[in-house]
Amino acid sequence: SKRSGKAIALHDLLDEISVDAARYFFNSRTPSTPLDFDLDLAVREDSENPVYYVQYAYARICSLIARQATAGNAVAQVEALDTDLLSAPEELALMKALAQFPEEIHLAARDYDPSRINRYLVDLAGDFHRFYRACRINGEEPALLAARLKLADTVRSVLANGLNLLGVSAPDTMAGGGFLYESKLEAGEIDQETAERAAKEKAEREEQRRQKRKAREKNRPLSDEADDVR
């Protein structure tokens, strides 16, 4: 653990972080590279935590598609779209990233290196967030709206497939951390009261984790057994 520089038993680690975070972080390095597990990073609920960042991108797209479906804008088949309308730099970057997915999977399998998938998903999530900030998916001309919605849905599918390969869940919704609700507030998806409530809940969860950690460190020595994480 980077927090203390000591070993920590795997079952103790899973008391503090989710299985999803553990799997994502354990797969974040090449097989030949030692892993210093950053426990503080693994419990963060913001864009610095890679698994949270990727899962949030997926959940945000699910929310977007559900809202558009309620408004009568279902995701269309590619054949019915005018993809030439997708010409903004952020749209082109996102399509280029999507096209790289099959090759990344091939290379990860060839080299026995799942960390390639980790890095790809983080990069793809970043490309989506930049696209989402720059390109409106609401109130646009119908043909452009349909094309952008399909692009977002394709990102959703690739994120789900990539997370599944890593054994990490792809949640349709997420309990709000600071990053998630700050982004939603900026996009006008929630109000200030909801964002403040989410921030308070996040602080309470962090305090609970600190208390559990203090109690465990006080009552139980750190183990150096075979199942330790270093």
Question: What is the role of each PLM region?
Answer:
Residues 1-197, 202-213, 230:
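Non-catalytic interaction-recognition regions
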Residues 219-223:
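Short linear regulatory motifs embedded in intrinsically disordered, acidic Ser/Thr-rich regions
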